[in-house]
Amino acid sequence: MPPAYDLGHSGEAYQPLDTGSGGGNEACAPNSSSAQIRHSMGFRTSWMRQFRRYKLPMVLLMLLFLVSCLAYRILSVEQDAPPLDLHRSSPLLDAYEDFSAMRAGDLKMRIEEMVRIKSTVSVELRELESRRQKLQSDISQYNQKIEELKQELLREQTELERLKISVEQAQVAQREAVQRNTPDLALPRSLLPNTLPRKSNPITGGMAASCEMHNCFNHSRCSLTSGFPVYLYDPDEHSVQRKGYDIDGFLKTTLKQTLGYNAHIVKDPKHACIYLVLVGEALLEQDLLRNNRYAAQEAEHQQPSTPTLENDCPVDMEKLYSLPYWGGDGRNHVLLNLARRDLTSHRTNPLYRQNTMRAIVVQSAFEREQFRPGYDLIVPPILGPPGGDVWQECAEMVPARRKYLLTYQGELRPKQSSLNPLDAFILEHLADMAKGATQDQFVLQFQCVPATEQQEGDSLPDWTLCGSDSSRRQLLKDSTFSLILPPLNGRVSSTLMLARIYEALRSGAVPVILGADELRLPYAETVDWRRTALLLPKARITELHFLLRAVQDADLLLLRRQGRLIWERYLSSVQATVDTVIASLRDRLGIPPRPVPSVIAQSVFNSTFIPLKSDPPVGLDTEPEESLGPIEPPYPSPAFRRNYTILRMQAKEAWNDWLDPFYLYPQLPFDPALPSEAKFMGSHTGFRPIGKGLGGAGKEFGESLGGNYPREQFTIVMLTYEREQVLMDSLGRLYGLPYLHKVVVVWNSPKPPLDDLRWPDIGVPVAVLRAPRNSLNNRFLPFDVIETEAVLSVDDDAHLRHDEILFGFRVWREHRDRVVGFPGRYHAWDLGNPNGQWHYNSNYSCELSMVLTGAAFVHKYYLYLYTYHLPQAIRDKVDEYMNCEDIAMNFLVSHITRKPPVKVTSRWTFRCPGCPVSLSEDDTHFQERHKCINFFSRVFGYTPLLNTQYRADSILFKTRIPHDKQKCFKYI
């Protein structure tokens, strides 16, 4: 039997097996005994037999072990290796068997088997990898879902806190409603009389001379809630002139037209409080053919047609007494004698020494014994146009100092008139002052050279006008001050004197009225003439030059500005004069004016169409953990609360500061604030103090509105033009905005919105209004659907966070009379232009003068002023350029308040991702804005914009606070 060989791992037979029983290291000798050989062969045969019996299980066990090790090795390698390593075969497989000892067929089968194993393992590994990636994706999704749920939890918790706060606020409002003990005032309802005036006995001239409002006026026809109804006798149907006289056709037509625009006029005489009778200017029929405003005669070669003052009155008193509603004594009648073409005393005071009984006389010229203070009314002559813009008649306000310090042109008529010693001394001193050796220039002429337009014919002495209207206008434009001499013979007012005041104010020459303590000026009950003119007694004539030099530029420009405002509002036109007369009489009686008309809103949708709604995106613009305020139902601002007190307590402000006593407004930005303790002691209604009065940081701040005024909300007005998707995105971002009352979308396009357009449901009403036409002025229309004082004007592409909006709202509540907003701009002086002009500038600057209304809060009061008070030329310029409406609003507010706007937060511009390119990025846009600023300055007569060098941020911004406290706003 051949010897057995041990097969090593290398597959090589290197040594015969030891068959000896000793188990030594040496080989057996060839001469061993046969017994030993047999014993050895038997043992080997038995061992081989046992080996063959367990060979197959052992091989299988070994293969299983090898496969497990191989799989473990591959998996451990695959986890760290790139995917390409999966297809590589491990070199360890080569070490398990000696493939060189195998036959080719077995080797091929072995290779195929290993390939199959590899393929199977690769498939399993790919499945495991795919499963692992899916698990990782699921884990990532679940983690994201967890974060979303956490955010949702925070939002819900914040919403819950807001709801709790809202419930508390609602409970407070309920308690206030229960405890309310004052009437809830609203728009007044008219309480009108329904009968004609009762017949009374006529009164004598002596009794008429002592008439005052308490003994000659019937208050029973003028209820506080009547609205002051006024009836006009048609001058064509109820003429009160003598034969041969008639009223100028221009005056009759214009008066009826202007009164037709007045809200107080009624057609039914039964409802009237007062009755207007036009008694003048009455001229001879031949004089009506003349066109010269100041002519009293025909040409010089013609015979004068002047009636005497005593025996020829152009008013037929019997016709006056026979008016259908005269009532026997003329109670509640107003006699209008408006001078226009003839300014001489005999024509402008036809009612002198006539018994007008209880009727109120309204005219320019009064004798001292004729005028009844507090009853009769002095008005300026009608020297202007019927109405409309009058800014072109005025001169620029700057520079403060003009060529001449003081000017006067006049001549005493009739020439044979004599002066008293004081008046003669005044003229002598003025002549010496004009000849004095000073650098100041004077024009003081007391004789007309060349001859005046005004011819002889006045029987009463007075200082007549020299030259033509254009020559006087040019001189006054070069005058810093204009001297006004009083009428002679102790008259309290004359038409010529008032004409001088009219012309001086129109040209920006500050009137210096000598003898003002002896005179009565127009509307003196309401207009504060001390803010418009220098009122001096005659005794101050020797100190006149010193006083004029003592006036500083700021005071001089303030006088000039106030004079122009008074002229524009109360003197400039027939419309202004008539409206002021009615307002003055109404003010005497303490009756509120008519409510200012609002623009009736017209929806773009018809009454049957219901627009589609969509859920708005939630949580895009606000931090979920920041509570900005409670959720409240819509709460309109209380309106018309001060109907019967504002003109009693703030009449001077209404007439001289706001310059608008003609309308009653729902609210004013000038309404007074209560003392701090009043909100806790008896006047708590509506107030929501921080921490119920204890104050606090961010948490308490977010729960209450606080401040110095009762709770209120704001309305967003958004102008849009054919940018539906941009509009929808902007509306969606307003969801959940605290203190938002309503959104008003002004649809400026002639095309209606698409029927399938989905409007986001943001929790408050969204009114989509049809604009009358495509105009940027529509942004500031005072729509009746705007029911709050605060109005946030925004562009449809402005992107504002909720905290920014609310901070701006809170700041506006402390600056209600100003523009409060985000993007700041300024007007810069063009140094390269020798004539000087303004440039609009949007660069970053430490000083600004405008806040653009593309994102700004304004009071609704300014919407009324922009629509009804702002000169039409400015609104026309806005339409011409389709630009500059925001500049116009800044001009208006600064003009009224003399204050700059307030900028909030650090935002300078507003980027709208994905929005179409706006017009503001065009260079033409900026060139037009340069022109707008300079044009608006010419219209106003000066540039009312004022500079500011600070912006507003919240109190605790960038302040270190304890960890258990919150800031007012996280990012502001």
From Swiss-Prot:
Cofactor(s), names only, from the UniProt record: Mn(2+)
Binding site for Mn(2+): D797
Pathway: Glycan metabolism; heparan sulfate biosynthesis
Disulfide bonds listed in the record: C884-C932
Enzyme class per UniProt: transferase
Pfam families assigned to the protein according to its UniProt record, in alphabetical order: Exostosin_GT47, Glyco_transf_64
Lumenal side: 77-972
Cytoplasmic topological domain: 1-55
GO biological process, one term: N-acetylglucosamine metabolic process
Glycosylation sites: N218, N606, N643, N843
Effect caused by changing G821D: In botv514; induces defects in wing patterning due to impaired movement of morphogens
Localization, UniProt: Endoplasmic reticulum membrane; Golgi apparatus membrane
Entry comment describing in which tissues the protein is expressed: In wing imaginal disk, it is ubiquitously expressed.
Annotated keywords: Developmental protein, Disulfide bond, Endoplasmic reticulum, Glycoprotein, Glycosyltransferase, Golgi apparatus, Manganese, Membrane, Metal-binding, Signal-anchor, Transferase, Transmembrane, Transmembrane helix, Wnt signaling pathway
First-listed, main subcellular location of the protein, grouped into a coarse class: endoplasmic reticulum
Assigned EC number: 2.4.1.223
InterPro entries associated with the record: Exostosin, Exostosin_GT47, GT64_dom, Nucleotide-diphossugar_trans
Residue sites binding UDP-N-acetyl-alpha-D-glucosamine per the record: R723, N748, N774, R779, D795, D796, D797, E885, D886, R929
Role: Glycosyltransferase required for the biosynthesis of heparan-sulfate and responsible for the alternating addition of beta-1-4-linked glucuronic acid (GlcA) and alpha-1-4-linked N-acetylglucosamine (GlcNAc) units to nascent heparan sulfate chains. Plays a central role in diffusion of morphogens hedgehog (hh), wingless (wg) and Decapentaplegic (dpp) via its role in heparan sulfate proteoglycans (HSPGs) biosynthesis, HSPGs being required for movement of Hh, Dpp and wg morphogens.
Subunit structure: Interacts with sau.
Protein name according to UniProt: Exostosin-3
Organism of derivation: Drosophila melanogaster (Fruit fly)
Lineage of origin: Eukaryota, Metazoa, Ecdysozoa, Arthropoda, Hexapoda
